[in-house]
Amino acid sequence: PFAIILFLSENLTPSVLTSARIYAGGADYRFELEKFPHLALLTTQANVFAVSDSAAAAGAVATGQKPNNRTLRLEASPAPLPTLLELARKSGRATGIVTNTSLTDATAAAFYARTSDPLDFQAIGLQLVESSDINVLLGGGAADFLPETKDGRRKDGRDLMLEMRNKGYDIVRNQQEMESTPLWRAPKVLGLFNMGQLAYADQVQVSASQPTLPDLVLQAILLLQYNPKGYLLVVDAGLAGKAASQNAGERTLREIASLDQAVAVARKFAGENALIVVAGKQNSGGLRLNGYSFRNDKGAAILGINAQGVPSLTWSTGPGSGQTTTPTGISHSEPSAFATASS
């Protein structure tokens, strides 16, 4: 294939996909990603633990070998394994990373960085600048590239954005600048559209000044398609996992729908000679769909208590669940999609 586009997201479980599908259009609705000719289930255990964390799951996808939890690509093998992006570059392909979280977040970083601390965002940003030959980088996380004197959080005083400009990258900070980039030059582009992660799909006022995930995917395709040997684009739809970790039910479902819109963009604009893969990493929050919503229910109709007095959606674990493995009950006094189950 000329184009290879890999979408990654947390919470692509049957329960969450079913909930998001019903929310988006009812029980008979189908997501674009559900129309693919091939569907499969996959396991995501880490090297030691039966349940993977985000960094280990992303590292497994990036290299094909399961690393340890709480590390970024520290595999069992003694030598670092090449990532999919590195292999793509060696074959002459252009490469890109798109994320609606930060470019230094674990999923995006798994494709270019290697560290024992996936939360050391400043060091990860440095690895991106010092070793990256990635053609297109679009997402959030500008604070990890700027010194404190420029409202960033780098304590070493380095302006990594300036360093990337000196390496030949076009720097874009908003949607207008991104869409004004001359495509015919096939430039290297670093787009940083917020100091932290990008806005959620339901944050209309904030997101109006930022590109959405479908916007980012379209721009990346337009930039990468000029390479005569094709390209590999990795898309991290990370906000679904961020929302789920906070038990934000409707927000989680809207982020899954946003991912599907980005998949639809890829299918439309990548051309017929394209391989598009959508893969889940791990599940956060344990969202469950209970009975019995009606077949035509959609949107807010599935967010509260159903006719039997049972929450349509419940969570297995809630914010702070990293400190406990004991689930607690759901409070029926709250809208179930927003109820927490943390201790």
Residue ranges and their predicted role:
Residues 2-4, 12-18, 22-59, 105-343:
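A post-motif C-terminal structural segment
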